[in-house]
Amino acid sequence: MEPRDPSLDALLELDGQVLVVDPAGGHWVRFVVTRVPASPEKPHGLDYSLTLHGPDGERLVGFDNAHTVPTRKRGEALDHRHRLRTVRPYAYRDAGTLLADFWGTVDSVLRERGVIA
């Protein structure tokens, strides 16, 4: 049995949350996180989508495991990240690292767009 991830509860509590991260410009984030049976595609037992959206609703950043990515083989973990128009595999370690990586990427994109300094 794997040790319990102490940051998992924090991630699960974000399910359904929509947070405005730029009230003046309208950027917002959305969290969809649910427990699912562990499988080769979702070995951590989570179905998740963490996204940053622009004022027009366009997804700018996304970390999810909803579909396969071109560089992965069938039956491998589906974890990946979207950054603007680029999709790359993501090496899921634990919920805390997922949240830190997501918020770090959100900050980077908001800086590039001149939303934050």
Question: How would you describe each model-predicted region?
Answer:
Residues 85-115:
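Well-ordered alpha/beta subsegment
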Residues 56-59, 107, 117:
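Alpha-helical membrane insertion/targeting regions
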Residues 32, 63-66, 81, 93-95, ...:
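Surface-exposed loop/turn and secondary-structure junction residues enriched for glycine/proline
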